[in-house]
């Protein structure tokens, strides 16, 4: 699990990196577009993933559901922000489906984290 923890931390850093890039692009290159929403998701989920890793380490969240929830947040964020960004930059129809799938994964990730916290409470 140690390598998964490191991978999730690295991916969270990438979410933050791309979130700042998209925020800058939204402000300077494409104001008034949904790039701001993509940036917001990335910039809020990046520290959330890091917080989840800390919560798993301290026992506030269970390991299995905690890591699974964090992974869902990472994948959901990439799909959501990637779908919005690709839709704005290309004429492909596939990206239109990525954002709703990513949003659904984000919702599922937060539900998994809720359950992880509940299960951790019951074990004490």
What residue spans do the PLM features occupy?
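Polytopic transmembrane helical bundles with strong interfacial aromatic enrichment
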Residues: 1-124
């Amino acid at each position: 699990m140690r390598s998964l923890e490191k991978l999730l931390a690295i991916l969270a850093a990438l979410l933050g990196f791309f979130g700042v890039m998209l925020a800058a692009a939204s402000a300077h290159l494409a104001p008034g577009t949904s790039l701001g929403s993509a940036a917001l998701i990335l910039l809020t989920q990046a520290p959330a993933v890091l917080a989840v890793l800390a919560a798993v380490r301290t026992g506030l969240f269970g390991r299995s559901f905690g890591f699974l929830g964090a992974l869902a947040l990472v994948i959901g964020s990439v799909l959501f922000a990637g779908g919005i960004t690709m839709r704005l930059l290309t004429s492909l129809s596939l990206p239109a489906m990525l954002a709703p799938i990513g949003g659904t994964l984000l919702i599922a990730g937060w539900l998994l984290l809720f359950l992880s916290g509940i299960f951790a409470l019951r074990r004490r």
